[in-house]
Every structure is written in C-alpha cells, then in structure tokens.
From Swiss-Prot:
Organism: Gibberella fujikuroi (strain CBS 195.34 / IMI 58289 / NRRL A-6831)
Signal sequence interval, chain numbering: 1-19
Gene (name only): apf9
The protein, known as: FAD-linked oxidoreductase apf9
Catalytic EC class: oxidoreductase
Cofactor(s), by name: FAD
Length: 585
C-alpha cells in the first residue's frame, strides 16, 4: 500500500472514531481553552472547571483549613449537594478523604470535567448546543442522590440544576385545566420551577396545611430523578407514586426546544417523564403536581429483637409472620417503613440486639384508638412469638396533628448522612410472595440469611391492596408498584467506595440473593432509583411492560441518543469504555 494511501486510511479511521465516540480530554477533538472561554462568556460566566471535592486535603493544592471543613462536612447532605461534582452515594470515588496508612490518591475520575451552573433555561439550551457541536458527553445532575451513578460521566459536560431556582407556588386550583381539560384533577396544586430539594418544599407545604408527595429523604430534587424515576413516600399508600402526581412539565429537549408535556401536549413525552427515568428524555425544568389537604394520623410502632445465633430461627419465624401480615395490614389502610437484620455487625439499641426488626406504620385520618383497634388482631399474631429465651416484642402507638408533624418526628427534619455506600439490591414483593405459601416464605428467609450480615430496608407501600389508588395508564411508573405490597431493599455495608474491594459482596447479592427474590416474586421488578447498578435484567425490572413504548418515545424526542445514562432507556446504543470515552455500540 502506498504511503499516501496509508495516511488516507488512518485519517478516515480517526474521523470514524471521532464520529462514533464522544470527545474526551487528550483527544484532538477536545475543545481548546479558548473555545471553553467563549462558551463560558455565552452563558454569563456560569461555567465551572471541576475539581474534586476533597482536593484541598491532598499535597500540591493542600489547604489545611479548607480540608478540616471538608472533613467535618463530608457526610453532610447539604454540603455534598452544594458541590458541582459532589455525590450522595459515590461508587469508585477517585478522590476520597485521605486515610492514614492508606495510599489514597486524588483525581477527577469519572466526574464531569466542566459544569454548567444553570441559573436559567437558556443556560441549558446553550450547554446542549455546545456539547452537540463539540461531540461531548452530557450528563444532568440536580442533587446527585443516585445509586445508579447516572449523573457522572468520564470526560463529560454537566448540566447542574442545583442553583436553578425560579420559585414555587401553591395554588387552590389546577392551572393545567385551563388549556387541558383532560388533566382531570380538580384539587389544589404546586408548581415548582427549578431544582428545589424536598427540604425546600416541605416546610412551606406544612404552613399551607397541605400534603405534598415527596421523598422520605428530603435531600433529592423535587423535579429531578426522584420524581422522574417513580418516587416512594410516606404518603404513597394513600395518594400513589411520586411520578403519578405530575400534572404537567416543561422540558428542554435534545434539539434545544422547550416544550410543555401534559395529557394534551406531547402526551407521549408526558408519559415517559412520569416514571421512565431521569436524564433520558430531556431536562425537566418545571413541574405542576397534585397537593392534598393535610390530615391527622396515628402510628403503630413495632420492635422485635433478640441476641445471639441461637435465637435466629425463632426471630425469623417472627419475621415470616410479619411479612405474611403485610397484605392484610394494607387492606386496613396501614403503610410504613421498617428495617431488619440478622447477625448485625455490631449490637443494636441499648439492649444490644444482634437480630432486630423495627417498623413504623401510619394510618392516615385515624385516631390513636382507632389505629390500635384495627391493629389488635395483627398484634396478637406477632406477640405469640415473644419467648422466655430472649425474643422480645414491643408494640407502641402514637398520634400526630398533621402529616408533616409525623414526618419530622421520624428524624427527617434533619438530613441523613451521605457519603457512605453499600452493595445494594432490591425487589418488589406481591401478596402471593408474602402469603401464598408460608413454608416457602420461611425457607426463603433462611436462605437469604446464610451469608454476611445483610441489612434490609422495607417500604411497605401496600398499593396492591390500596382501595383508592390505582395505576395511571398515562404514566410510565413500573406496573410492579401497583401489583405489590412491599419493596424489600437488601444491602451489605462497604467501608470504601472501591467496588473491586467488595467484589465478593456484589457477587453474593447478584448470584445468591437476587435469584431467590426473583423466584419468590418473579413478575414485579424493582425500583430503579434504589436498585443494583449492575442489574442484568434492568429493562424488565426497572421498566416492565412499558419498555417498548418508552423506547419509541426516546427515538422520537432524542433520535441521536444525545441524553445518555447507564441502565436508562436507549443506553444499550452506547458502550462506556472503562476509564475512557462513551462510544456507539
């Protein structure tokens, strides 16, 4: 082959690579400093060159005073959210806090290289245009509360919505009805324009005497991935999943066009952004959601505890009974959150339990006496497990004047610690799984407690048995939510964000525990926002029967697949090279 022919072939190959892979630092196609500067000027100086959150703690840029503040604030949710590349639950963190005795290093890793600090919709459209012109990977981040790592991306440009705040307003009517009679909702509403966390919304809602369906954790963004991915809350049993509250939305598309999505405009997009996942179909800048008059509520609180391995069989007998009672409790109107563990890594509570089940149920609109009376038959079944050899059962009750008084009593008036991660998976369990065969359920509990200590978080939403809440056909919420009683999240704690160091824990979850859960409840799936990032059946488990329809919406509104995130609709058109660029599959 002649030299000029070889050069031509190599040139064509380089062009082909540029066309099929996103540009990353070090490649000839990466924008020059001058180009970045011009882009920064076009968005009013809102471009941030990223630096790792803990960078000040490392030699070179080390700043002892700044480092002390970072160390003190590291697990503070508000602190991490306020950082352009701060994340609540980071995996493979490339710049952890230095640990004495360990050779920790600091780099930007898979975090975005530049960040658009969005303050208006025009910043978003200009960021999209620049990323498309320069063939850059774009990621969308509101608060970074994401176990799936969807708001990170090697060599990317980030659209950061934390400081985009144009206000929120409560209304005694549904403004969507003025242009869209099909909206249907005739109650009060809340319009949120910007990247407000639920912590911003809840105090105002309480003052208005209203219930807003938002996260149990008040840290996530109200217009972001929590809502777009589904969203469970203390009010889910009574009012439905978070995504189903949305009446309309403003969305910035990959084309740069800003559209309204409602039952009357862009109906297919309206369907997709309500449960089809965030960061996928466009950038949502505003939503209008349903609100509800607040009510008094009562609670039933349960603790079952024991010490030592010898009590584990009787403890699991009690857990099996509680699980089997959940569908019946749902029919009576009870719902709530719980936790349990067998052989805890360290003793729990002042009684030093090693095996503990704790649950708090709510009954909206009921007095304390009414709640106690309705719970009595269930209490009698649970108390039967109390024994002289150390299995203790405690049941108490309470009452609250309104929804948010209860919410704040749960400790949610303060922000939960962030920064730590775990090997996590989850499954929605239906009535058949919980009540179909008691012996099979008990064997299942034995099987999932044979290995390392696994900590369970229970979201007893009870939608399968909810009398007044049904699946919305105009919503992409996973159908399994409305065909199940319980979301069981199971996790193994990690002392580092290094996934490779805990490869055995992830293998145990994926190869041992997850198949057992799938066998118990095969057709329900799980909640995409609180699931294993390595789930191999993610299309079925995260989207269920909606997958094909969502893929059509993706193709219509983002035909080039510009918006990419892992395990999202359309993501299998791309491949993430380890430590490198994003390329066409």
């Amino acid at each position: 082959m002649k030299p000029h022919t070889v050069s031509l072939v190599l040139s064509n190959l380089a062009s082909l690579a540029a066309a099929t892979c996103k540009c990353t630092p070090g490649h000839a196609c990466w924008p020059s400093l001058e180009e970045w500067s011009r882009f920064n000027s076009s968005i009013g100086g809102q471009l941030i060159q990223s630096s790792p959150v803990a960078e000040a703690c490392y030699s070179g840029p080390k700043d002892n005073a700044a480092c002390q503040n970072i160390e003190k604030s590291w697990t503070d949710d508000v602190f991490q959210v306020s950082q352009p590349i701060g994340y609540a639950w980071p995996l493979n963190l490339s710049c952890p806090l230095p640990t004495p005795g360990l050779d920790t290093k600091c780099s930007i890793g898979n975090s975005p290289v530049y960040v658009v600090n969005v303050t208006c919709e025009e910043d978003i459209t200009r960021g999209i245009k620049f990323a498309q012109e320069k063939n850059l990977r774009l990621v969308v981040k509101s608060t970074g509360h994401d176990s799936q790592q969807r708001s990170t991306g090697y060599g990317s440009l980030s659209i950061w919505l934390h400081n985009f705040r144009k206000g929120f307003r409560f209304q005694g009517h549904n403004p969507v009805l003025a242009t869209c009679p099909k909206s249907g909702w005739k109650g009060s509403t809340l319009t949120i324009n910007g990247g407000y966390s639920w912590r911003d919304i809840y105090p105002a809602a309480q003052k208005q005497g209203l219930i807003v369906i938002g996260g149990l954790d008040r840290g996530p963004c109200s217009t972001g991935g929590w809502t777009q991915g589904g969203g469970h809350s203390p009010g889910t049993h009574y009012f439905g999943i978070g995504a189903d509250q949305v009446l309309s939305a403003r969305v910035v598309l990959a084309s740069g066009k800003i559209v309204v999505a409602s039952p009357c405009e862009n109906e297919d997009l309206f369907f997709a952004i309500r449960g089809g996942g965030g960061g996928t179909f466009g950038v949502v800048t505003e939503i209008t959601v349903k609100t509800y008059p607040t009510k008094a509520l009562s609670t039933i609180n349960l603790i079952v505890g024991s010490k030592g391995d010898e009590t584990v069989p009787k403890f699991l007998d009690a857990v099996a009974t509680i699980y089997s009672l959940l569908p019946g409790l749902s029919k009576k109107g009870f719902a709530g959150y719980g936790n349990w563990v067998v052989r805890a890594l360290s003793p729990i509570t002042a009684k030093n339990y090693t095996n503990l089940y704790g649950q708090s149920w709510t009954l909206l609109g009921a007095t304390q006496q009414e709640a106690e009376n309705l719970f009595q038959p269930f209490k009698e079944e649970i108390v039967k497990h109390q024994s002289e050899n150390g299995l203790e059962v405690t049941v108490s009750s309470g009452t609250f004047r309104d929804y948010f008084s209860y919410y704040y009593s749960m400790g949610n008036g303060t922000d939960s610690a962030v920064g730590g991660v775990s090997a996590l998976a989850s499954r929605l369990l239906d009535t058949e799984a919980l009540q179909g065969n008691r012996k099979d359920l008990r064997k299942f509990l034995d099987s999932i407690t044979q290995g390392s200590a696994v900590y369970h978080t229970l979201i007893h939403h009870g939608l399968e048995a909810a009398a007044d809440v049904k699946a919305d056909p105009t919503s992409a919420v996973l159908p399994g939510w409305y065909k199940s009683i319980l979301l069981d999240e199971f996790e193994i704690p990690m002392n580092t964000t290094d996934v490779d160091a805990y490869a055995g824990s992830f293998e145990y979850l994926r190869n041992e525990l997850v198949p057992l859960y799938e066998s118990l409840s095969p057709d329900t799936g799980t909640y995409m926002n609180e699931a294993d990032w390595g789930n191999m059946n993610w299309k079925k488990d995260f989207f269920g029967s909606h997958w094909d329809r969502l893929l059509k919406v993706k193709t219509r509104y983002d035909p080039e697949g510009f918006f990419y995130c892992p395990k999202c609709v359309g993501s299998d058109d791309w491949v993430e090279n380890k430590g490198g660029s994003l390329c066409r599959a």
